[in-house]
């Protein structure tokens, strides 16, 4: 029964027959053909409230007449019809024609059926047919409001809208069109017409259980359009049948999905031609049931799907798809064709395009697909699936085409067959491609003539058991991201190529499966792959031959993978295999591979050959290049064997694995070849492996990574390196139990940059023997494992490790390490030897080096270590551990060696025994060191002669309860940077001795625990502790410290701290100096014995001794020793209450800039004995400061020392200081009395000896300086008291100013020594007693010590004056010594003068010392020292002046030298001459202390001995001699006089040269250049005497050189007279030498001894000649020829240098005025007798020395 039957019959207008309806509104339904055939025309506007039905039999098929009925309705002539629901042909044949531009509006449209009770008495011919023609339209709308009838008075009935009615999805609604529910429906849209469906179109639904037999039809032609705004879908029947025909630019547009023919036996035909278009904005699903047929033909048309396309799917379906003539099929998502079992698909694309997201064709078992194309373009962006299913077959044949896919699946399934042939075509896949996937598949892939297969993803061909594939590429390209061919058991692959390019960027898999076989034969080809898998599987066989071809893989390559595989790899003549990643060949049990390389290259990132049990690998090569950038694996498996034999070849690998597996055998031989590995190399891995590695000369193995050989139990390795290189980043040889390794080398270079492991395993053994070799490693592990045995011998060889080295690791291991001369082991990291319980190590280093960052030898319980060395160098920069473990033992014995470590642990463990012995060796630790650390340990350290032990950190020896430690240092140096701990632990015993050595430590701790017993001795040593020096710190502890001839410097000292502690410290000629504090005997009832003797020093910035109550302290400082308490204000001796302290300083010193308190505790008692030259130069010593305390200071028998107390008897204490038998003792800085009161109980007595007052002192009280004693002031003092100086006593103020009340002087007071000025101020009187004296110092001109007496003077004191050569007096005068303001009754007399430490006694009333005379005079009340210069220096200076001037001649001082030629002269005659000279003058001392007059007389005679002339120039030589005398008289400022006398003679030679002497008598005229030179010897006798009874005689010799040059020029005149000008230069040098002269006191006197004169000058001369004409003169005609007068006047300026005016009198320099002088000279020479001349000259010198001289001489020629 129809669900809406009642509504359709109520208010209905039923028409049977023919009729016309125009312009009507029907309030009910309009039913055409209810019981009979009917035919109706509708014109105008008709609005129907309910149903508009044609041939519906009232909606019930049983009511239809037998055979059915026919009814039709035509809406024409632009009519407009509206109806709520329109039904055409419900179980009868109905036709609705809309023509002539008419329009139908309806909310639901049913074409062929709305009934659910279809019966068999009505055939499918009873269809409904809808025809829309000639520009007409049908609109299936949602409501009346969407139509022109929205304002019509007749409103459409919404209640009759069908909501279900067995539609497939269970629902229909307004806006839906249903086609072919109860029979096939037909819709024709023609001639520019339109069908517009607002919601869904339901196609060919049928009735449940009764499918339609004929397909419904939709015909869209001639530019018509069918628009569906919802889905286009099928109904509920088992099959859907539809024929869709489109032609001539027609369009089907579905806004959502198309899903028709979705039941079994569906039959869908789609035909579109002439630019028609089908568009689905959703999915496109047609004929998807079993046994369905889909036939799509596109001819110059388009199919466009915006969703998923599914065509002809279902078992047994047949799909034909013909796309041609420029057609385009586009499915933006997936497209599936013929999916199901037994499907058939025939896809032909000719000059057209197929574009889809994913394309699946013939997916199902037994599917048969044929795809052909010419000029085709196939694009499947996602997947491309063809014939996927068992027994499926695919034939693809394309010519001139392009196939662009995403992923591809072709011929996939059991026994599938695939034939893919490309001719000048390209298949391009952006994803994966699978071809022939399945067992027993058969695949033929043929690429011809520039064809290509380019797969961006994986390409898999013939995958399955017994699958076979034949790939032939001729001048073509096969490319895939991954390429897999023949995968499965018994797969068979044949690949041939000529000029081929095979590319598989990711993987390349060939014949992968058991019993698979692969034959690859390429010539002139290129194979570029990613990863490769060839011949992989049990018993697989692979034959790969390349001839002039290249296989390149960017990834991995696997060949012959599987048990019993057989692989032959042959590379000939310039062929290459280049694998960027791993290459694996013959992997599997009993797999075999034969690799032959001849002049070719095999390269891989990783290369693996023969992996598996009993695998067999043979690799040979000549001129081969093998590269494996990552790994290189050969014969890896139990019982595997590898034979590698290369000559003239290069093997470059990354990681290498050769002969790995139990009982594997490896033979690697390199001849003039190189193996280089950038990664690891592992050889002979496995139990019982045997590995032989032989490197012949010029060969090398260089492994950048790790190299492992013979790894496994019972593995053995034999490595021979003969003048070759073996290197690796890490190297492991023989790793496993009972492994045996033999390594020998001569001229070998072994390098292992990271680790080097040899014979590592229980019972393993290693023998390494190298000579003239180098071993460079990183970390080393040799002989590791229980009971492992290691022998390492280096001869003239070096082992260097940049990391760690571990040898003999394991229990009961035995390790022997021998380094022969010139050998070395250098480990940059840690070195560990014999680590394990009961392990033993023997290390011998003979003139060799052993070094490591950290070194551990014998670490484990009962470990035993013996280390010996001679000339050894041991270095362990970080830690050095030897015999670390309970009951371990260590013996280290080194001589002439060097040991440098970081932290050290030697013999650490309970009951360990340690012996460390150094002899002439150095031991340096940059960190800490523990020796014998643990309870009950025994440690013995001996640092012998010439050794140096340096620990930068802490050193612990014998640390632990009941530990025993002995540390001896002899003739060595010990340097501990931090702390030295010796014997730390309860009841420990520690003994340390340092002899003739140096010890430096940051801290020193000995016996720091309860009941510890420690001792330390040092002799001739230096000990320096920067930090704490702690000894016996613990209750009941005992410490004995004995230091002889040693220096101990420390920071803080704690010696004996604890209750009842006992400390004995003895210093003998030693220094114990703390930069901070020293605490001794800290604790109640502590006992301290401190003995400091024989030039020892005990010093601390703070010293506290006996801090506890009832402490007993005995301190003895003797033998010129020093006790220095430093700068702290808290040093104490006897700080505890009731403490008793005895401090004896005997011939020793106490210093301190801070404070020292003796007897600080209440009721404490202290005695300070300063004896036998004790010195207390302390700034702040307090005595008896506690309540009821008492302190006594006894200073006795002292030659030197210092005492600086600042507080004595403070509070209620009592103190006194007694000096008895002191000499040079010092009482220093700011001494004040204790109670700040009258100091009535404070007495300072200088009973015997010498006491110094140092610093600026201010005190009260009595100071008594008794007979035979001396008190020195070392500062400026102020004394509120009387200074009593007893007879035979001395007080020395040392140049410091003193201010005191008064002086009672019976002894001697020294103001200064002449080096510093002292002023003494007395507020009251100076009382002198007979025999008393005062010494004053003078410091120069009127500077001296002065005593200022405000009161009176009485008695008589002698005065001593002291000075030195530094205190210069320039001019005599009076110097104040004593100033008296009161009564000056006292007298002073001059006793002596001390100069430069020598005393000169008074002579009469004066003292002559040096150049000065001293006398004491009283003027008014004051006393002065008069100082005057002695006269004798003036006599000595003028004696020398006379000697330097005497016998000095210039040319014109010789008579006859002004001679001119005359008419009567014989120019060549020689002559004799005689000359007399008188010279006198006066001079004075530079400060006018002396004035002198002098005179000089000489007579000289000479003669020419030879002359010569050339007629113009004239020369002659002469000799000369003479004698002379001189006298002088000097007067001083105090009218003392001295005279000097000189007598002497001279001998000499002279020479004269004169230019321009004519031999013509009347023409002669002398002018031109002339020279004069002479040499002279002088001898003098001298004497000096004075009114001071001084007399001295001395002889002097002299030598003089003279030179003179001039030029005589005539300046005109009238004969017989002429005028001349004559410039000249005179030079002279005179030297004197003679004996030493001494004054009366024995002082040396020097005198002037050299003079150099340079005197330029000019003379003007006049000549007058008169010839005799008188007869009266005739009688003299033989003698008187003519008279000649030569007169001259001129001068010169004399420059003088040399010592010619100074004398030194016993270091006093006296100098006379000197200056360069201007000398005026004049003279006249007469010739009035034949051949005779007379000379008279005079000269006057103008300077400080007024000098006048005259010369008279004569000359005669003969």
Curated annotation (Swiss-Prot):
TM regions (residue ranges): none
UniProt domain Autotransporter: residue ranges: 1465-1758
InterPro entries the UniProt entry points to: Autotransporte_beta, Autotransporte_beta_dom_sf, Autotransporter_pectin_lyase_C, OM_autotransptr_brl_dom, Pectin_lyase_fold/virulence
Residues spanning the signal sequence: 1-12
Keyword Membrane listed: yes
Bilayer topology annotation: Peripheral membrane protein
Subcellular location: Cell outer membrane
Highest taxon of the lineage: Bacteria
Keywords recorded for this protein, A-Z: Cell outer membrane, Membrane, Plasmid, Signal, Transmembrane, Transmembrane beta strand
GO cellular component, one term: cell outer membrane
Keyword Membrane set for record: yes
Protein name (Swiss-Prot/TrEMBL): Uncharacterized protein YuaO
Annotated source species: Escherichia coli (strain K12)
Lineage start: Bacteria, Pseudomonadati, Pseudomonadota, Gammaproteobacteria, Enterobacterales
